[in-house]
């Protein structure tokens, strides 16, 4: 099974603070300020495990085709389970949503049982939670209960699961145990072994970041820039301005991509004051991963991106992102990689356009044209589209191969202190189309992406709807080079939005460093062991 375990591999500590229960719109809920959606789901799973054990009700832990945790129970024990849950949830905002029949509203388990149906076969249980900013943990983050019919020779399941069909011959079933979340669970042999459709390899993430508010950095940058001619918008304040977007970009990883193994922050700035030391976070200085240190210092993101594959300890498969790019909802590793490691990139509708590179264009537009010419010379195919502003998947071995094949272009870009009209843009399109043309990348056509120019009033008007519906896998809150909105007003609106969209402090924030909390989400390097 891909990327699920406790962070420390042991039994998670119990929370010491009694939950606050509130009523909102006629429904009760916990006020949640510490658990991510996945952590809350696991906490509910462990809660249900204890209820079942105390009631002496046998169960199996299985996984469905979407890797949601499922507890399978003999249908003859459903009435007893309903009574046990009603008693255990007397003071809990535990709700049950019937999956058998779409459209049925969730019911409060303590008073209304498991379903409005007389004979439900699949229900989803969850403790309703409300986080700061109004983020609600609903049935999407629930634990599924399935009621199986045990006959003399077969077991009939209401739906297929990740391993088996709806009818299980009893003579083909081999019970076993699996250790997950600090506990031993009864299951079926093969259920939690790595499946061919699983992404089981390590995936790291790299962010590039600069603290543009540092007066010394700004002075050094301006002094060196005066000696160069830069393209349209490349000298803009927006290139370096930051309002703690990195904090919320990292929160988005913690909340929605807990399968990320390690996070590297490529920066020569002083670490932000909110960042605590944490084993999952590594600050990487340019001198640690630039092949040619004589090229430093650099103020060129293209240069930094051309050297990412030299970061010590970086996994073969990794994601790269800027601090203005966010995960908008829970994502699987398969959004970025196939089980065999093929990368999946997201093309934008925007065309690169006509014309060659020239000093008057922006560095972004020039690099796309340099990429296009190099790839045409190598493969005889023309790339036509930019990529979306999202985190991108990369493979270290492919980048090493590219640097060997295009040594002059990599070296020239790494040595350019500012964006130049001869730069390549490795992470924006060069890698992805090179990998596509060599059979190691494919377009990702299912992702939902939103780009917002937060320096325009039209862009700011999109934020309330974005927060309310949370319907995008990725969104970018870009700081445009030609602003319409005053900087202070933009900062207030954007930070307010981000704080409400990502209300759960990550464990590497100083505000969370001393808080006792469950610690579930750092992935294993392999699937959990069966029979443990």
Swiss-Prot record:
Disulfide-bonded cysteines: none
InterPro entries for the chain: Stealth, Stealth_CR1, Stealth_CR2, Stealth_CR3, Stealth_CR4
Pfam families: Stealth_CR1, Stealth_CR2, Stealth_CR3, Stealth_CR4
A GO term for molecular function: transferase activity, transferring phosphorus-containing groups
A GO-annotated cellular component: peptidoglycan-based cell wall
Entry keyword annotation includes Transferase: yes
Enzyme Commission number, as recorded: 2.7.-.-
Keywords annotated in UniProt: Exopolysaccharide synthesis, Transferase
Biological processes annotated in GO: polysaccharide biosynthetic process
Family, similarity comment: Belongs to the stealth family.
Note: Stealth proteins are part of a protein family that is conserved from bacteria to higher eukaryotes. Family members were first identified in microbes as proteins that help pathogens to elude the host innate immune system. Microbial stealth proteins are involved in the biosynthesis of exopolysaccharides. Stealth proteins are predicted to function as hexose-1-phosphoryltransferases.
Protein name: Exopolysaccharide phosphotransferase CpsY
Gene expressing this chain: cpsY
């Amino acid at each position: 099974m891909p990327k699920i375990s406790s962070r420390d591999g042991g039994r998670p500590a119990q929370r010491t603070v009694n939950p606050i229960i509130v009523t909102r719109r006629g429904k009760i809920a916990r006020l949640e300020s510490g658990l991510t959606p996945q952590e809350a789901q696991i906490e509910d799973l462990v809660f249900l495990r204890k209820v079942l054990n105390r009631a002496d009700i046998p169960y199996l832990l299985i996984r469905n085709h979407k890797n949601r945790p499922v507890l399978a129970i003999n249908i003859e024990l459903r009435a007893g389970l309903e009574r046990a849950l009603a008693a255990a949830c007397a003071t809990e905002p535990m709700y049950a949503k019937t999956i058998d029949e779409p459209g049925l509203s969730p019911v409060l388990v303590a008073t209304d049982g498991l379903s409005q149906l007389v004979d439900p076969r699949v229900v989803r249980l969850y403790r309703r939670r409300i986080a700061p900013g109004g983020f609600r943990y609903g049935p999407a983050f629930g634990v599924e209960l399935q009621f199986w019919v045990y006959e003399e020779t077969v077991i009939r399941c209401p739906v297929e699961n990740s391993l088996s069909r709806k009818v299980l011959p009893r003579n083909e079933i081999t019970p076993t145990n699996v250790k997950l979340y600090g506990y031993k669970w009864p299951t079926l042999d093969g259920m939690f072994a790595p499946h061919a459709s699983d992404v089981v390899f390590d995936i790291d993430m790299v962010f590039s970041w600069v603290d543009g508010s540092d007066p010394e950095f700004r002075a050094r940058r301006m002094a060196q820039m005066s000696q160069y001619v830069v393209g349209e918008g490349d000298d803009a304040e927006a290139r370096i301005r930051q309002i703690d977007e990195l904090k919320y970009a990292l929160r988005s990883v913690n909340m929605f991509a807990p399968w990320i193994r390690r996070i590297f922050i490529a920066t020569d700035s002083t670490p932000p004051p909110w960042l605590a030391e944490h084993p999952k976070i590594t600050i990487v200085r340019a001198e640690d991963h630039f092949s040619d240190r004589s090229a430093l210092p650099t103020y060129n993101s293209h240069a930094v991106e051309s050297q990412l594959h030299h970061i010590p300890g970086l996994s073969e498969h990794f994601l790269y992102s800027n601090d203005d790019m966010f995960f908008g909802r829970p994502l699987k590793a398969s959004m970025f990689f196939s089980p065999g490691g093929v990368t999946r990139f997201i093309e934008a509708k925007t065309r690169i356009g006509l014309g060659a590179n020239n000093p008057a264009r922006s560095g972004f537009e020039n690099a796309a044209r340099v990429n296009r010419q190099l790839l045409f010379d190598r493969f005889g195919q023309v790339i036509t589209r930019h990529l979306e502003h999202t985190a991108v998947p990369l493979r270290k071995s492919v980048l090493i191969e590219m640097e060997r094949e295009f040594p002059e272009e990599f070296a020239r870009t790494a040595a350019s202190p500012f964006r130049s009209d001869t730069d390549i843009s490795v992470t924006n399109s060069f890698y992805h189309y090179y990998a596509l043309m060599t059979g190691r990348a494919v377009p990702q056509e299912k992702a939902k992406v939103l780009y917002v120019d937060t320096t325009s009033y039209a862009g700011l008007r999109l934020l309330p709807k974005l927060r309310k519906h949370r319907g995008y896998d990725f969104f970018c809150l870009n700081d445009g080079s030609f602003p319409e909105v005053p900087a202070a007003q933009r900062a207030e609106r954007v930070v307010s939005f981000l704080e409400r969209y990502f209300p759960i402090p990550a464990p590497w924030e100083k505000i969370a460093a001393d808080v006792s909390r469950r610690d579930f989400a750092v992935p294993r390097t392999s699937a959990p062991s069966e029979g443990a």
